[in-house]
């Protein structure tokens, strides 16, 4: 396992934030009909992967990727709710709960 340092956690947090930003810009792009937002989305995805590549220097890839994806999904869900009024049905909430349980289990492993 790589040597953990807080800087790697900061890179992971940055990757998560950039993924959320990319997803919001993607929604604003309206299927890339609004090219400016589409380009911003692509730039944010590239920056997110760059930050993730720095994070995995000190965090196992399996843990970093699972946390990046899980927190990204949960936070994008929250952003969709706040910014766009999107809601989940009961099956969707079950999925979110299972996702969170899985992230906790990975962190505790």
Curated annotation (Swiss-Prot):
This is Spermidine export protein MdtI. Pfam families: Multi_Drug_Res. It is found in: Cell inner membrane. It comes from Citrobacter koseri (strain ATCC BAA-895 / CDC 4225-83 / SGSC4696). Keywords: Cell inner membrane, Cell membrane, Membrane, Transmembrane, Transmembrane helix, Transport. GO terms for molecular function: amino-acid betaine transmembrane transporter activity; antiporter activity; choline transmembrane transporter activity; spermidine transmembrane transporter activity. It is a multi-pass membrane protein. The keyword Transmembrane applies. InterPro entries: Small_drug/metabolite_transptr, Small_multidrug_res, Spermidine_export_MdtI. Its main location: membrane. The keyword Membrane applies. Catalyzes the excretion of spermidine. The chain crosses the membrane at residues 6-26, 36-56, 64-84, 88-108. Belongs to the drug/metabolite transporter (DMT) superfamily. Small multidrug resistance (SMR) (TC 2.A.7.1) family. MdtI subfamily. One of its GO terms (biological process) is glycine betaine transport. Forms a complex with MdtJ. GO terms for cellular component: plasma membrane.
């Amino acid at each position: 396992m790589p040597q953990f340092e807080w800087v790697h956690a900061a890179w992971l947090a940055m990757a998560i934030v950039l993924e959320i930003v990319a997803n919001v810009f993607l929604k604003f792009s309206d299927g890339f009909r609004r090219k400016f937002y589409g380009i911003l989305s692509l730039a944010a995805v590239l920056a997110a992967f760059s930050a993730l590549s720095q994070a995995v220097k000190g965090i196992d890839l399996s843990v970093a990727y699972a946390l990046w994806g899980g927190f990204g999904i949960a936070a994008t869900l929250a952003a969709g709710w706040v910014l766009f009024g999107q809601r989940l049905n009961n099956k969707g909430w079950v999925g979110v709960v299972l996702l969170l349980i899985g992230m906790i289990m990975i962190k505790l492993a």
